[in-house]
Amino acid sequence: MFHGPDKPWAGEALINTLNSLLSKARSAGAPVFLARHVGPPGSPIEPGSPLTQLVQELLLQGDEVIFEKSRPNAFAMTDLVDRLKACGSQGVVIAGMKTQYCVDSTCRAARDLGFDAVLIADGHTCTDTLALKAENIIAHHNATLAGPFCRVVHAEHWHF
């Protein structure tokens, strides 16, 4: 979706932020889980579609756990909870796209499932909609989710 027809807001900055987070996680020995959103066969995001692939700009090293999800919430219909518990994780750091769908849903679900949820304020993005510019969607979600659903922290201030 990152390289789809609608370009995400501040996409290059997001890639830099995500790569910084990956580096920090590795240095701290934190497990890294990456979700790929897939849709039904025949849809633009059917399994195997180029739109569902992780972007090549991410500096992956092969030690990441990459899983597919078919719902906005990364926990729904996946084994993410079991995998997190198996490695002793009590919290999750959430970043990616799209802000108003997958990022929002995953933040809310993480807290409901008992995880300490951290949303990286400058670590998620989306595209403009007919109603709002992407920058405003991101700011709104950072403000709305902070507190009841997660902690919102800028990447430069986050330490694993």
Question: How would you label these PLM feature ranges?
Answer:
Residues 1-4:
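Metal-dependent nucleic-acid phosphoesterase active-site entry motif
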